[in-house]
């Protein structure tokens, strides 16, 4: 049994309406059965597969004090285009011909998993598709999602985030070999720190009476006794849980933390964050959800783009969540602290879980409320992509109405968002005008919907979500209680997530409801609206600097100064826009450094820097280079040319004199994305060149006799005497660098400094650039006469070009 405090006064819940009273759009959005407080749903797979399929529901009691378990019947199903493909199995399934003319015209339902998989295998044989999934079937892969779709139930109804029992944990590992490796027997887990949202904390650690195997058994016992609904951690999938599972295997300890006493199931998975895809080992725990705050921070940064990195400490400081007098220890010092400052390290570990709790509480709200709508569990809602979320809503409603499903179109989208740069240089003041919900507004006002959406769900759900969000935002303004306001904010954010996902469905190649022509129509219309906005800003005396998909950065007219005037000017642009399109004020900045398209820096009135794009500052660059560029940008924004020159000279002198804070200042750290054997095979086949990271990993393995595996991180620096050395032949592990006898390649790092400095070439004349970024100071440097350049850029779009408009 797990205990928790009763729910606090909650905000109005649109999902709580009885199905008989709910509108069609609400039933489609929230499901037909408002069963409350479902925490998790798990298929029962431990019996014979020929028996009737069932699921186990984990449900909080009315007072939230305990978990109630009960099993329910479940009927595995799929949609099929041709029912005759199942000829010969007629006594093993039930089917229904669906309404409409869509491709998947029949619903097929089974009583057992044996019958279900036999039917799929027969279709594979009859369609010659054993090598790939047959096009004749539309299958919902997750049994849990199938159950939630057919029952019309969703998780977490009538609950708030804190009604869930959320447990945070973090491990610390002792290693003498750089980054911990669970395959090395000596790389032991030394500390496991816990906290939860009930005010409880606990530290487990090695001591004279506790070896690692005992520590692992204690960890299992603590999790089972606390019985949380959610396990939260930072990078918990790729490190903490995976490492514990590996160490449990080493010591023959069952990591049996499932609510049914099972060991977690692991499998390879991936998540996409804008242009970046992250592979990770997913971990499923029966009856519980795993939430990784590392992924939450990455999701946040897709839109903010101003986090320097995704570490727990950085994120906690960014959001103002770090505990007062927080203990900080660098990762490389963990083992030393265990030997020399054990109490300090224990304080550090406890601060880690406290930060994780605060971070998860801050970032989990929208996902929590998404789970109240989607036929997905809380953990799945946190990890599934936007198109999958929308499609799950559509399939649930098509299933409820017994309507055939469309087949995804072949093809691709040809139009994208409108991005352009008109002026590079340093300008200010800056206003950001945002076309509010540009693509959703276009889709609503221009009757956009996929051709296969026979039920018109696309416009119905989009309109209902938009209305719900506006109503919730108004409730937020009216609410006096801060807790209620916070809950409402999370709820409106969940609506926003779904609203912004509709466009992605149109252009997603694997979506059953895709429509590339409609996706292109939305993008093309968006481009035209932004061009109208640009023209209107210019007509009213503003200077447009850049346009980026759904907003415009501009210098307001001379007579418009101060926040109130800037807001009035920006919002007033709406009157020139097409019906249903609103222009909003989305920020003001003291100055802007415009570099190239989709790459710029903004200086807030509080003195903070915000960056867009990776051309200026890339996380793959050496830390000293990132620091140099960041400081140089600030000096440019301040028009401090002398300070910029001094920064260059100072950084150069530090490189020449090996005046580094540590090897981390100039070392690169890269992750092994392949095994060493796969790397060698690719090199031998001529599929890739040799790389410093892998060559050093091989050296490390040979030197220590300890295995290096995929996912390990290698930190290294460049050696040698000339700037043009071959990296894999002239590199050493960062741990080998000796500050008393430095052997880094000074010429190479001076070249890297000059490469960073070249980013600023567009802001000066050629002669001035050579003066500013020159080490020659014999006669002293003077910034007199040096002007920061502004350059106009020819637009990708010309006002007089003849272009077909689709409306």
Regions found by a protein language model. Give the residues of each.
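Active-site-proximal helix-loop-helix substrate-binding element of RNase H-like nuclease domains
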Residues: 202-206, 227, 231, 241, ...
């Amino acid at each position: 049994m797990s205990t928790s405090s009763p729910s606090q006064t909650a905000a109005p819940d649109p999902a709580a309406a009885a199905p008989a009273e709910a509108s069609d759009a609400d039933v489609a959005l929230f499901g037909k059965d408002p069963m409350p407080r479902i925490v998790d749903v798990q298929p029962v797979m431990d019996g014979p597969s020929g028996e009737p399929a069932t699921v186990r529901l984990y449900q909080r009691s009315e007072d939230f004090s305990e978990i109630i378990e009960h099993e329910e019947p479940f009927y595995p199903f799929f949609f099929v285009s041709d029912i005759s493909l199942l000829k010969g199995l007629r006594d093993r399934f039930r089917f229904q011909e669906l309404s409409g003319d869509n491709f998947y015209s029949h619903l097929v339902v089974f009583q057992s998993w044996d019958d279900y998989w036999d039917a799929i295998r027969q279709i594979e044989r009859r369609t010659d598709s054993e090598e790939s999934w047959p096009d004749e079937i539309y299958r919902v892969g997750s049994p849990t999602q199938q159950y939630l779709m057919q029952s019309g139930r969703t998780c977490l109804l009538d609950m708030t985030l804190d009604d869930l029992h959320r447990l945070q944990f973090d491990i610390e590992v002792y290693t003498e070999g750089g980054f911990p490796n669970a395959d090395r027997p000596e790389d032991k887990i030394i500390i496991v720190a816990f906290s939860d949202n009930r005010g409880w904390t606990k530290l487990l650690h090695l001591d004279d009476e506790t070896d690692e195997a005992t520590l692992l058994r204690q960890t299992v016992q603590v999790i089972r006794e606390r019985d949380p609904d959610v396990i939260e951690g930072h990078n918990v999938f790729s490190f903490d849980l995976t490492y514990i599972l590996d160490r449990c295997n080493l010591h023959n300890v069952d990591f049996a933390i499932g609510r049914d006493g099972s060991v977690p199931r692991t499998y390879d998975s991936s998540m996409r964050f804008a242009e970046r895809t992250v592979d990770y080992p997913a971990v499923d725990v029966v009856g519980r959800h795993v939430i990784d705050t590392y992924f939450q921070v990455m999701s946040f940064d897709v839109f903010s783009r101003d986090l320097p990195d995704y570490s727990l400490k950085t994120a906690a400081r960014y959001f103002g969540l770090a505990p007062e007098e927080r203990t900080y220890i660098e990762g490389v010092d963990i083992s030393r602290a265990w030997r020399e400052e054990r109490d300090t390290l224990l304080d550090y570990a406890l601060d880690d879980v406290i930060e994780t709790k605060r971070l998860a509480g801050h970032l989990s709200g929208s996902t929590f409320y998404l789970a109240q709508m989607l036929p997905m569990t809380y953990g799945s809602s946190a990890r599934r992509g936007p198109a999958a979320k929308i499609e799950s809503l559509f399939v649930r409603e098509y299933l409820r109405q017994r309507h055939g499903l469309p087949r995804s179109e072949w093809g691709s989208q040809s139009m994208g968002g409108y991005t352009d740069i008109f002026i590079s240089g340093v300008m200010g003041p800056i206003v950001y005008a945002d076309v509010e919900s540009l693509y959703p507004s276009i889709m609503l006002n221009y009757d956009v919907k996929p051709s296969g959406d026979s039920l018109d769900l696309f416009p119905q759900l989009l309109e209902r979500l938009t209305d719900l969000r506006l109503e919730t935002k108004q409730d937020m303004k009216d609410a006096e209680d801060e807790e209620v306001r916070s809950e409402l904010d999370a709820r409106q954010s969940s609506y926003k997530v779904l609203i912004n996902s509709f466009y992605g469905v149109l252009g997603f190649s694997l979506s059953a409801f895709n429509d590339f022509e409609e996706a292109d129509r939305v993008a093309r219309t968006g481009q035209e609206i932004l061009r109208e906005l640009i023209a209107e800003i210019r007509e009213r005396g503003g200077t447009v600097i850049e346009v980026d998909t759904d907003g415009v950065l501009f210098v307001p007219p001379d007579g418009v100064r101060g926040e109130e005037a800037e807001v009035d000017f920006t919002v007033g642009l709406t009157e020139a826009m097409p019906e249903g399109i609103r222009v909003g004020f989305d920020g003001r900045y003291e100055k802007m450094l415009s570099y190239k398209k989709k790459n710029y820096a903004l200086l807030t009135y509080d003195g903070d820097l915000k960056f867009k794009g990776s051309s200026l500052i890339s996380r793959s660059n050496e830390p000293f280079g990132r620091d140099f560029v960041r400081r140089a940008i600030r000096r440019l924004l301040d028009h401090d040319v002398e300070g910029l020159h001094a920064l260059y000279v100072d950084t150069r002198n530090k490189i020449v004199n090996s005046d580094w804070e540590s090897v981390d200042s100039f070392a690169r750290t890269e992750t092994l994305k392949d095994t060493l054997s796969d790397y060698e095979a690719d090199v031998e086949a001529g599929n890739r060149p040799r790389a410093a990271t892998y060559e050093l990993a091989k050296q490390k393995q040979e030197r220590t006799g300890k295995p290096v595996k995929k996912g390990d991180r290698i930190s290294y620096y460049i050696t040698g005497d000339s700037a043009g050395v071959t990296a894999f032949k002239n590199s050493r592990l960062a741990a080998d660098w000796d500050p008393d006898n430095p052997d880094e390649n000074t010429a190479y790092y001076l070249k890297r400094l000059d490469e960073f400095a070249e980013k600023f070439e567009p802001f000066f004349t050629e002669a001035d650039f050579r003066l500013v970024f020159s080490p020659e100071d014999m006669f002293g440097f003077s910034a007199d006469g040096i002007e920061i350049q502004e350059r106009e850029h020819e637009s990708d779009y010309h006002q007089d070009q003849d272009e077909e408009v689709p409306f």
